[in-house]
Swiss-Prot record:
The species this protein was found in: Homo sapiens
Cross-referenced SMART domains: RNA_pol_Rpb6
The protein's name: DNA-directed RNA polymerases I, II, and III subunit RPABC2
Chain's gene name: POLR2F
GO biological process, one term: transcription by RNA polymerase II
Subcellular localization, as worded in the UniProt entry: Nucleus; Nucleus, Nucleolus
Positions with biased composition (Acidic residues): 1-34
Similarity remark: Belongs to the archaeal Rpo6/eukaryotic RPB6 RNA polymerase subunit family.
Length: 127
């Protein structure tokens, strides 16, 4: 039996009830009761002036910074430290992190929608 021989008249789905949840969604849109707040394009979350988060780099931030920087180095970005025969981008990124020369800013988002920007050179790195 091939696809050309099948008869799909659309009558096979007569016994299915319509979903009433869609009607509720349509009614909410008609009444103007949206739960979404739309901000103007110029209005963005503000950076906190006084920092409240810890000055320590987390292991997740460290992994993300090293991975991002290693990818940049692999794609021929300029290296910020003197090379002593290293060719592995990850090892070069680790050397840059130890020398605090990675040109990346970490943005930490807070629950109220604001954020804090920390330079890699400002954070305390534990090994």
């Amino acid at each position: 039996m091939s696809d050309n021989e099948d008869n799909f008249d659309g009558d096979d789905f007569d016994d299915v009830e319509e979903d009433e949840g869609l009607d509720d969604l349509e009614n909410a849109e008609e009444e103007g009761q949206e739960n979404v707040e739309i901000l103007p394009s110029g209005e963005r979350p503000q950076a906190n002036q006084k920092r409240i988060t810890t000055p320590y780099m987390t292991k997740y931030e460290r992994a993300r910074v090293l991975g991002t920087r290693a990818l940049q180095i692999a794609m021929c970005a300029p290296v910020m430290v003197e090379l002593e025969g290293e060719t592995d981008p990850l090892l070069i990124a680790m050397k840059e992190l130890k020398a605090r020369k990675i040109p990346i800013i970490i943005r930490r988002y807070l629950p109220d929608g604001s954020y804090e920007d920390w330079g890699v050179d400002e954070l305390i790195i534990t090994d």
